[in-house]
């Protein structure tokens, strides 16, 4: 199993990043809350990974630290929650925000996440609350959220950031029409792709 990658960031195409380690390029799917904190292109990054093997694909999911990965691994154990939905959940909320929402039983906040209906939200609260008791670390005893950094350079800006941002939202589980509407609501000329995605997800909550 691939549990950790250390290498150079070659490409960023939310929510995927291409990282080269020892001459091999790895495509890694990351929650947007983790994606925002990646270094610039051509710089070194360390990513903790979870490897998923399916009949039709082998996928790597990446995180900035072990606690975020542990949360993802617990999420995909919940009935009805697969890796794609877990990725969408942790893109719509930071790991700390999600833990807080579950602890406070904020069903209304959870159902605003893509792919999460009332039944799934209720299941998340019931099952994840118990799972948190077996996990250690500051993340699982949240006090307040940590502001996210979202570095962006001219290299990482897309020629059409609005289209790229909408495509990223679709990859996270939003319908194309809904994704376009979300981006159009917060679009502004100077915003890059990562900023548009972050603002659209925040506005949806």
Swiss-Prot record:
Region (Domain III): 157-205
Subcellular location: Cytoplasm
Predominant location category: cytoplasm
Presence of keyword Hydrolase: no
Gene3D superfamilies linked: 5' to 3' exonuclease, C-terminal subdomain, DNA helicase RuvA subunit, C-terminal domain, Nucleic acid-binding proteins
SMART domains, per database record: HhH1
Any one Gene Ontology molecular-function term assigned to this protein's record: four-way junction DNA binding
Annotated region described as Domain I, given as residue ranges: 1-64
Entry GO terms, CC: cytoplasm; Holliday junction helicase complex; Holliday junction resolvase complex
Annotated region (Domain II), positions in chain: 65-142
GO biological process, one term: DNA repair
Domain of life: Bacteria
A Pfam family annotated for this UniProt entry: RuvA_C
Region (Flexible linker): 143-156
Cysteine disulfide links: none
Reported function: The RuvA-RuvB-RuvC complex processes Holliday junction (HJ) DNA during genetic recombination and DNA repair, while the RuvA-RuvB complex plays an important role in the rescue of blocked DNA replication forks via replication fork reversal (RFR). RuvA specifically binds to HJ cruciform DNA, conferring on it an open structure. The RuvB hexamer acts as an ATP-dependent pump, pulling dsDNA into and through the RuvAB complex. HJ branch migration allows RuvC to scan DNA until it finds its consensus sequence, where it cleaves and resolves the cruciform DNA.
NCBIfam families: ruvA
Subunit organization: Homotetramer. Forms an RuvA(8)-RuvB(12)-Holliday junction (HJ) complex. HJ DNA is sandwiched between 2 RuvA tetramers; dsDNA enters through RuvA and exits via RuvB. An RuvB hexamer assembles on each DNA strand where it exits the tetramer. Each RuvB hexamer is contacted by two RuvA subunits (via domain III) on 2 adjacent RuvB subunits; this complex drives branch migration. In the full resolvosome a probable DNA-RuvA(4)-RuvB(12)-RuvC(2) complex forms which resolves the HJ.
Similarity comment text for this entry: Belongs to the RuvA family.
Domain remarks in the Swiss-Prot or TrEMBL record: Has three domains with a flexible linker between the domains II and III and assumes an 'L' shape. Domain III is highly mobile and contacts RuvB.
Protein name from the UniProt record: Holliday junction branch migration complex subunit RuvA
Organism: Pectobacterium carotovorum subsp. carotovorum (strain PC1)
């Amino acid at each position: 199993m691939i549990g950790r990658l250390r290498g150079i960031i070659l490409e960023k195409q939310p929510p995927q990043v291409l990282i080269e380690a020892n001459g091999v390029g790895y495509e890694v799917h990351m929650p947007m809350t983790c994606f925002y904190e990646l270094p610039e292109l051509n710089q070194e990054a360390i990513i903790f990974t979870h490897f998923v093997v399916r009949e039709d694909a082998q996928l790597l999911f990446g995180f900035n630290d072990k606690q975020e990965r542990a949360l993802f691994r617990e999420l995909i154990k919940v009935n009805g929650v697969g890796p794609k939905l877990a990725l969408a959940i942790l893109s719509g909320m930071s790991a700390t925000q999600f833990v807080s929402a579950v602890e406070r039983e904020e069903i209304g906040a959870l159902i605003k996440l893509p792919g999460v209906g009332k039944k799934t939200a209720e299941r998340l609260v019931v099952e994840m609350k118990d799972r948190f008791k077996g996990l250690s670390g500051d993340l699982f005893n949240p006090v307040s959220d940590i502001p996210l950094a979202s570095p962006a350079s001219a290299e990482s800006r897309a020629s059409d950031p609005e289209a790229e941002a909408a495509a990223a939202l679709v990859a996270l589980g939003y319908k194309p029409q809904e994704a376009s509407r979300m981006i159009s609501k917060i679009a502004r000329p100077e915003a890059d792709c990562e900023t548009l995605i972050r603002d659209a997800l925040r506005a949806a909550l």
